[in-house]
């Protein structure tokens, strides 16, 4: 909030958009923009896909956010441990892409905010733990 207020004072109409490292910061920026009469006029994006951010997107005050899907992240940890413990697979024999991998995030904008809200906030998402690698988007690469 304080940073955005300072930027609005210093840069005024030169601010064409605000990227925030998380939704909480993005929402604070929106609060400052509201006080300046510019909420919804300056695009603000965040990361996390929290309820208040999705609601701000629905109101047109926030341009977007990325949800990293905490249900899936937590579930993956449990599903992998469960499958290893019950003998579904042997982690020592799994390829490297099943040890260090990226998950697929969800980009939330005005186009899909209501659908995301309905399926991930208003209710719990449907996840398929029989296919634990189905949402993996690739192996982490190191240079």
Label the model's feature ranges.
Residues 1-143:
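A residue-level marker of the well-folded mature domains of exported/periplasmic proteins
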């Amino acid at each position: 909030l304080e940073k955005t207020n300072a930027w609005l004072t210093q840069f005024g109409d030169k601010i064409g958009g605000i990227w925030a490292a998380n939704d909480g910061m993005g929402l604070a920026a929106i609060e400052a923009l509201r006080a300046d009469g510019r909420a919804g006029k300056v695009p603000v994006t965040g990361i996390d896909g929290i309820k208040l951010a999705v609601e701000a997107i629905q109101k047109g005050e926030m341009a977007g956010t990325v949800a990293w899907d905490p249900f899936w992240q937590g579930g993956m940890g449990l599903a992998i441990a469960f499958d290893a413990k019950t003998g579904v697979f042997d982690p020592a024999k799994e390829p490297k892409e099943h040890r260090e991998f990226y998950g697929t995030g969800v980009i939330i904008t005005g186009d899909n905010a209501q659908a995301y809200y309905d399926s991930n906030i208003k209710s719990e998402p449907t996840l398929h733990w029989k296919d634990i690698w189905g949402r993996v988007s690739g192996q982490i690469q190191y240079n």
